[in-house]
Design a protein with these regions (language model features):
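Glycine-rich loop-to-alpha-helix module at the N-terminal edge of alpha/beta enzyme cores
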Residues: 58
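Receiver (REC) domain active-site loop signature in two-component systems and cognate sites
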Residues: 29
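Polytopic endomembrane small-metabolite transporters, centered on the Drug/Metabolite Transporter
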Residues: 88-90
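Asp-based, Mg2+/Mn2+-dependent phosphohydrolase catalytic module
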Residues: 2-25, 33-35, 42, 47-50, ...
């Protein structure tokens, strides 16, 4: 793919909820953390919807069904129906269905979300390698997924059965912090078998295809908290993205982002959907946003001025990404970020 290398966050003269017809929202770390809504999420989403924006919830978490996800969101005060939810389970089920016959048995290492998605594609979920599956699919199964389930996957894969994974997120955010995600479980099976799975979830094309097919979005905006899934998925799909800082990405990771991990816009939380985005402009040897000016020095990023912390971060992104070009920035931004409280 040939794309222009992004060297700064973009500005927007109108609210993002007006500039785009559909928000493709990640869930964990964006809308909620654990069982609780993230601050400002409920009101921001209600305002965006009232203004005519279609909201779709796109998650790499394959554990729960779209019905269950919609129910949870509705309980949090975000009215949602199952058709508003797109999961990596649905994407991987479509991928499998394109390679095996209707009615084929598929060994499931994961939760109910995978089973429901497979049945929707006319496939039969099974639990044992002895059930003669023609494929193995692995997705997040929650904290109670046992070692014996990984063993069943290994037994089937050793017989030459193709292996699929809903996603490879190494971590998942929760109310108590960061926990192992499906990617960590996939690594267990990979190491044990030496096999490589076909992966459907963000940032790969099968998930983007599933999302566009189900939403019909024409001017989508990906909204996420992860650089290596949400933002890279938007890059691969050639659509714009908004990074919110309510999940796993911190300022240092953002400054060091290679081109495929650089978002179109950066904001603190989902309130960023409701506003225009400030311009980052060249200023001498550096870049200015709001009251801050950032420059790339010999070994570090330097920041002068005062104002909103997010404006300082946007200016630092421009200095870092411009200095790095097509690579990841190696300049130290620690002092500048500390000055912003980030």
């Amino acid at each position: 793919m040939s794309q222009t290398v992004r060297t700064r966050p973009e500005g927007s003269g109108q609210a993002l909820s007006e500039a785009y017809d559909t928000a493709l929202l990640d869930l964990d770390g964006v809308v909620y953390a654990g069982g609780d809504a993230i601050a400002h999420a409920v009101d921001s989403l209600a305002t965006a919807r009232a203004g005519g924006m279609h909201l779709a919830y796109v998650t790499n978490n394959a554990l729960r069904t779209p019905d269950a996800v919609a129910g949870h969101l509705t309980e949090l005060g975000i009215p949602t129906v199952a058709s508003d939810v797109i999961t990596s389970a649905q994407a991987v089920a479509r991928l499998i269905s394109e390679q095996v016959p209707v009615g084929a048995r598929v060994l499931v290492i994961g939760g109910e979300g995978l089973r429901v998605a497979l049945r929707e594609r006319g496939l039969e979920p099974v639990d044992s390698a002895e059930d003669e599956p023609v494929a193995v699919v692995q997705g997040y199964g929650g904290p109670d997924l046992t070692w014996s389930r990984f063993a069943e996957a290994c037994y089937a894969i050793a017989r030459g059965v193709p292996w699929f994974a809903s996603n490879t997120d190494l971590t998942i955010p929760g109310a108590r912090g960061i926990a192992p995600g499906n990617g960590a479980a996939v690594e267990v099976v990979r190491i044990a078998t030496g096999a490589e799975p076909q992966v459907a979830g963000k940032p790969l094309p099968p998930m983007h295809r599933e999302t566009i097919l189900r939403t019909g979005a024409e001017r989508p905006l990906v909204v996420g908290d992860r650089l290596d899934t949400d933002i890279e998925g938007a890059f691969n799909g050639e659509v714009d993205s908004l990074l919110v800082l309510t999940g796993v990405t911190d300022g240092a990771q953002l400054l060091a982002a290679p081109p495929q991990h650089r978002p179109t816009y950066v904001d603190a939380d989902l309130r960023g959907m409701l506003t225009g985005q400030p311009e980052v402009v060249e200023a001498g040897d550096g870049f200015r946003c709001g009251g801050w000016t950032a420059t790339a020095g010999g070994q570090e990023l330097e920041l002068t001025g005062e104002g909103e912390a997010l404006d300082g971060l946007r200016a630092l992104c421009a200095a870092a990404w411009t200095a790095a070009g097509e690579s990841a920035c190696e300049l130290d931004g620690g002092k500048a970020l500390a000055r912003l409280g980030l």
